[in-house]
């Protein structure tokens, strides 16, 4: 082998090693910034998290915060996937940290409004950036004493299983963080009979999964019907069944998006 070819081979090997180190570091950072599943269980009667990035890192994340008797839970799906979407997760997490440390904002709809303005302001003068700054977000507020619950969504809905019924609590159609002049507003919805319900927040990737008997995208109604069939089970068992259901639905097809599902009971 000539010296030039040896040098080229060495450079390629070094590039692969360095890239793998970056990948490993990004993966560690991605998972370290997210709360652990057991933290959810400290604040909800039952809870689970399914987090399956398409690649080594993902663009789905969640945030948990407790203030007095109120617990706040947010799931956000940053547009795109991989490293760039993972970077946006940190930006959204930092914006939420800034909010709780310096502002008295307690309604889920108001939190979405803050997030939208904060991300817009951060990227206002960066028209040529490669990042997609917008995200789908769902936020739940639970008062642990009264068991009252509120929800607000930015292009994200909430599944509620209650008695023998599946309800879809709709959020607004607008995302947060879009770099447009369109005026955004987000309302908070009070949830009925929260103490006797199971709730599920799902990233958009769940409903991008293609498969099933008709080789189509999974719908929220289909997932809701499956969860309803298993409503008597504890959420630990439901998590295992939900993972199996999503895998079976996809079948031999490749996972085409990041997936995150959070289930919880008040």
Residue ranges and their predicted role:
Residues 192-200, 206-266:
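C-terminal catalytic subdomain
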Residues 1-5:
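N-terminal membrane insertion elements
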Residues 7-198, 251-266:
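… and, occasionally, acidic/histidine-rich disordered N-termini of signaling adaptors
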Residues 79, 205-206:
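Acidic beta-to-alpha connecting loop that harbors the catalytic carboxylate
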């Amino acid at each position: 082998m000539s010296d030039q070819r040896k040098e080229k081979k060495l450079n390629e090997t070094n590039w692969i090693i360095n890239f793998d180190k970056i990948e490993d570091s990004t993966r560690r950072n991605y998972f370290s910034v997210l709360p652990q599943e057991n933290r959810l269980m400290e604040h909800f009667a039952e809870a689970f998290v399914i987090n399956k990035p398409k690649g080594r890192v993902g663009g789905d994340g969640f945030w948990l915060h407790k203030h007095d008797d109120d617990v706040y839970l947010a799931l956000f799906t940053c547009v795109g996937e991989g490293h760039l979407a993972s970077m946006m997760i940190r930006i959204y997490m930092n914006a939420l940290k800034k909010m709780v440390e310096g502002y008295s904002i307690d309604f889920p709809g108001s939190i979405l409004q803050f997030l939208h303005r904060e991300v817009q302001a951060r990227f206002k003068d960066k028209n040529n950036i490669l990042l997609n700054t917008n995200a789908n977000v769902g936020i739940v507020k639970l008062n642990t004493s009264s068991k009252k619950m509120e929800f607000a969504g930015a292009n994200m809905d909430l599944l509620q299983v209650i008695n023998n019924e599946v309800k879809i609590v709709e959020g607004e159609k607008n995302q947060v963080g879009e770099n447009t002049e369109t005026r955004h507003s987000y309302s908070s919805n009070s949830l009925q009979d929260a103490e006797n319900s199971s709730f599920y927040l799902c990233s958009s990737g769940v409903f991008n999964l293609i498969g099933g008997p008709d080789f189509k995208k999974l719908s929220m109604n289909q997932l809701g019907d499956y969860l309803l069939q298993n409503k008597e089970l504890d959420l630990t068992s439901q998590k295992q069944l939900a993972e199996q259901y999503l895998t079976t639905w996809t079948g031999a097809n490749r996972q085409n998006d990041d997936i995150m599902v959070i289930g919880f009971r008040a």
